[in-house]
Amino acid sequence: MKSPYQITNKIVELIASISEKIGEVNSAHLYRPPTELRKKNRIKTIQSSLEIEGNTLSIEQITAILENKKVVAPKKDILEVKNAIIVYNRLADYKPYSLTSFCKAHEILMKGIVDNPGSIRSKSVGIIKGSVITHVAPPGNIVRSLLKDLFDYLKKDKDLLLIKSCVFHYEVEFIHPFMDGNGRMGRLWQTVLLRQYSPVFEFLPIESLIKAKQLDYYKILGESDNQGDSTGFIEFMLQIINDSLEDLLINQNVNLTSDDRINIFKEKTGSDSFTRQDYMRQFKDISSATASRDLKEAFDKGTLEKTGDKRTTQYRFKNKKLNTTLSTRIQNAL
């Protein structure tokens, strides 16, 4: 299944702008944002995506939950947050083109909140706002086949991944594959897909920009439904993605730590040996003293091994995972 849409001038311009900004992100080493920024953005993502669905917890309350502090709030809201923390911590584990993985994420996200989380619905559902039915989802007996077609589209179609991620988000909202939790799953899985385009999207709070334009978000979803065409929604989401990258670049004055730089450099070099000069060529804005300090700290932690002395020193990453790998550090932070 391929959602009908048109390639407009706006879509072309936004894709070009996003591609340009990804280049700037890579040049500034922001595809793995600093630890504190990652934590801050992850909290914003969770809070915004859940608030769209009516969750009442604030950023401060979610931060308190992450720090194992007591929070006075509805039990359901607290459970939604705890589930979302687990799901977003496992983003790298999900298989973006797998329906099974998609359902597993829903199972975790909605555990204790709905009956049979992770199960594709078999009943008919509609969305009611006030006394008005705003959307009648496809009949339950065809939902599984619609999802199969949708995942086949992800795997086989030659569309750009940026467009595919928007189409998928829209189609999840339209198909309404679960009895509840469809909105947050559409937003979550677009992030899972965007990670394939660039790792920066793992910690980019796209949901917070959607929340800021929530009325427009639902309005454009409704218009796309009525028109049977997802062009408007694709334009809307590409603009959100572009704006989120722009915000990251504007606020890039958060300093990288030595651990951040070492992790970034490891991704670039792998197991190849290197010198301090090689390290400084990657990070042109640091002094030789800072470079030496970074490398010494990594050596003292057992991350690096070295041979030679002074100017002839050669470094190499040991054949084991860094103690401060991104996933470990984020899980510790959260």
Predicted regions and their residues:
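FIC/Doc superfamily catalytic core
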Residues: 1-334
